[in-house]
Amino acid sequence: MPQKTLFFAFFFISLLSFGQEETLFNIVRTQTESDDSLLPDRMVFTQSLLWGEKGVMRKTGWYPLNLELREKELKLRRSMLKLHQIIGYATLAGMITQGVLGTKLYNGEGRLYDTHRMIGDITSISYFTGASLSLFAPPPLTNKKQKGLNSIKAHKYLATLHFSAMVATNVLAGKSTRLHRAAAFTAFGSYATAIIVFKF
């Protein structure tokens, strides 16, 4: 019951954050009036690969770099990050379920193995789908380096940790119960913390 309450609390907070809409057209136009560049100076490698000046989207001609299409990219970014957020809560629910099932399995309830494995596969698919949405979304307008620790930086640092832990959890499944369990709890702890720090 507390797990359901926790999940619904996270989901409700997420819904509230969707109401904070920005006027993308005004932001883009204001930015381009003062800056000739339509792209930020700093981008994640995956964003640069797809959306950089010489990225795949530019070379294929699907998204030439111009003001009109940059506005569409920012709308696409917003949609991808909203979906990333929704999938993130579904993944968190899967991780909580896995924690309960995994603990029971660890304590000798072998009949739960197939269920644990199936939910583990679903949770992994949702996790890596959500991660891809974030990593491959078009870049923001600006990405200036900020001094000190803030919620976005903390979210990114924790993302590095839970991504590594999720890879380890999948690699260690069926190989080392003790290490698999440690990786899974590390993934859950850092993932849940990443959601919390991003909201507050």
PLM feature spans:
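Bacterial Sec-dependent N-terminal signal peptides
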Residues: M1-E22
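Serine/threonine-rich low-complexity intrinsically disordered regions
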Residues: P2-Q3, T23, N150, S176
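N-terminal targeting leaders of membrane proteins
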Residues: S17-D114, G130-Q146
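Hydrophobic alpha-helical membrane-anchor/signal-helix detector
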Residues: R77-Y106, T115-P138, K153-G174, H180-F200
